[in-house]
Every structure is written in C-alpha cells, then in structure tokens.
Amino acid sequence: MARPAACLFDLDGLLLDTEPLHARAWREAAAHFGRQLNAAELMQLRGRRRLDCAEQVRGWIAGAADPESGAARSDPPSVEALLVHAQPMAGAPELVRRCAELAIPMALATSSSRAAVALKAAPHPWLELITVRVHGDDPELREGKPAPDVFLLAAARLGQEPSSCWAFEDSPAGARAAEAAGCRVHVLLPEGGDPEAYPEGVRWLESLRELVL
C-alpha cells in the first residue's frame, strides 16, 4: 500500500484518551438541568466543537441552558484539572514519530480550542512533532465537524489535496467530516461505538498499532 501524502489527525479519543473526561463534563452539565444523557447522546457529541455540543445539549434540555452558560462549558474546573493527566491512546506516540521519521507531513484537525489543546498536549512532547494545526476556534474555520472544513483547511495548510491524505478519527462526526473532505478515512472505533453510525468504506482500526507505514 502506498504511503499517504499527509496524515491528518483528530486529537481527543484518537491521539489522547480524553473522551471519557469530556463525556463526564457534558453529563454533569446536563444533570445540572435535570437531564440525564445516555450513551448514544454522548456519542453524538463526540468529536464536535464545544459550542456546537452546547447547542445540541440545550435542545435536549428543552432550551433551559444558554450556550454560554454552564452547559456550554465542556471543561468544568474539576474535569479541566484531569485533562493534563490524559494518557496517549495505544500506539499514538509511535505513529506520530514514525510519520516524522518518514517525513510524512502531519496536521492536527481537532474540534478543541487552541487553549484546550495546549493544556492537553503539554505533558506529551511527541505532539510537538505535529506543527500544523487547525483548532476548533481557528479564525479560518467556518463550520465544525461533521462539516469537512477542518480537514480541507488542514490539507490546504500542508499544501496537499485531501484525496491524497489519510485522516484518522474516532467519532462519527469526525469520520463524516473527513469523508466529505475526500480523505481516506481510518477510524479507531471507540468502545460502545456503532459501526453503522460511520460512513461506508472507512478503514477500521482496533488500535493505532495496527497501522504500518
């Protein structure tokens, strides 16, 4: 199999094991308004921008929360303090280092804000190898996942056609975004994830260690 022209990586749930912490934050925020989020609803929030998630949660709690209120805070202080302890997903550091060794261009295509990425990435110097980044609050980003914008922008900043790039995702929203951008999509299926929620034709991974470059 030919190597990709570039690799475009999601962050949460793909390179770092932060998704359980974000799920906890949204569960607590909704519970504050008397709404219990189930696993399927939490999966719908996975991979999306904070304010996009807040709008969704506000709908679920019948308009009780404003996007800038407590329900919009994806990282309450108690959870934010835990993010710096998030561990790498199995095989993530090795994959990123392998791309660097092979001089395969890399970009981060994440829904997390610049500040949130800085917080999560600080304990993981291997993430510094990914110097091109598109954050959820990037001023050039028009729409968040599942729109393709984040992957289109990441590929453009690397000077590559999206169709020549491999995109790595874990969420249905992210996989749909990467597919819509025209990337070859690799999905690290999360525990409890429903394959039918993802686009057809993705390459499934049980671990990033499976990937050979």
Regions found by a protein language model. Give the residues of each.
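Asp-based, Mg2+/Mn2+-dependent phosphohydrolase catalytic module
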Residues: M1-A5, R97, S113-R114, A118-L213
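Anion (oxyanion) recognition and catalysis
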Residues: A31, A100, E179
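Conserved SAM-binding loop
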Residues: L15, P88, M106, A167
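Phosphate- and divalent-cation-binding pockets in alpha/beta enzyme and binding domains
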Residues: A25, C53-Q56, G91, A116-L119, ...
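Helix-loop "lid/cap" segments that line or gate small-molecule binding pockets
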Residues: R27-A30, R49-A64, K120, A154-A155
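Metal-dependent phosphoesterase signature
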Residues: Q36, Q56-R97, L102-I104
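Active-site neighborhood of HAD-like aspartate-dependent phosphohydrolases
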Residues: M1-M43
